[in-house]
Amino acid sequence: MAGTKPSDLGSLKVGQYVVIDGVACRVMDTTHSKPGKHGGAKVRLVAMGIFESVKKEHVGPASSRIDVPLIDKRKGQVLALMGENVQIMDMETYETLELPMPEDVEGIDSGVEVEYFEAMDRYKITRVISK
């Protein structure tokens, strides 16, 4: 599953995902403001990139549309540690993937079950399920 779908900017909440400038991000903060009697409400999003640690901001009318990435969460088993990369096997399809070693996840070793997700044709290991 890859790609995006449109969503209303005003309906996004903290913790949801959004695409800003072609980068898949997790929403860290939202601010609603109504400028006055005339004009629509504005929404200001502050988001952090999922795959690279970049801070992104977006301001727009609450009624406007913004892309939301389609995220597929999956389980896999670590087959091998190869320097900066980890080779995992998907537990449902049994296909093997080579993913970069995450800096923020502890306990990755051969034979460990991990959770990873795919968004916009990129993959990331999010946590260790069992050791």
From Swiss-Prot:
GO CC term, one of those recorded: cytoplasm
InterPro entries: IF5A-like, IF5A-like_N, NA-bd_OB-fold, Rib_uL2_dom2, Trans_elong_IF5A_hypusine_site, Transl_elong_IF5A_arc, Transl_elong_IF5A_C, Translation_prot_SH3-like_sf
MF-aspect GO terms: ribosome binding; RNA binding; translation elongation factor activity; translation initiation factor activity
Pfam families hit by this protein: IF5A-like_N
Location (main, coarse): cytoplasm
GO BP terms: positive regulation of translational elongation; positive regulation of translational termination
Listed Gene3D superfamilies: 2.30.30.30, Nucleic acid-binding proteins
CDD domains: S1_aIF5A (cd04467)
UniProt keyword annotations, A-Z: Cytoplasm, Hypusine, Initiation factor, Protein biosynthesis
Subcellular location: Cytoplasm
The keyword Protein biosynthesis is annotated on this UniProt entry: yes
Described purpose of this protein according to its UniProt entry: Functions by promoting the formation of the first peptide bond.
PANTHER family: TRANSLATION INITIATION FACTOR 5A FAMILY MEMBER
Family recorded in the similarity comment: Belongs to the eIF-5A family.
NCBIfam families per record: eIF_5A (TIGR00037), PRK03999.1 (NF003076)
Protein name in the entry: Translation initiation factor 5A
Organism: Methanococcus maripaludis (strain C5 / ATCC BAA-1333)
Recorded name of the encoding gene: eIF5A
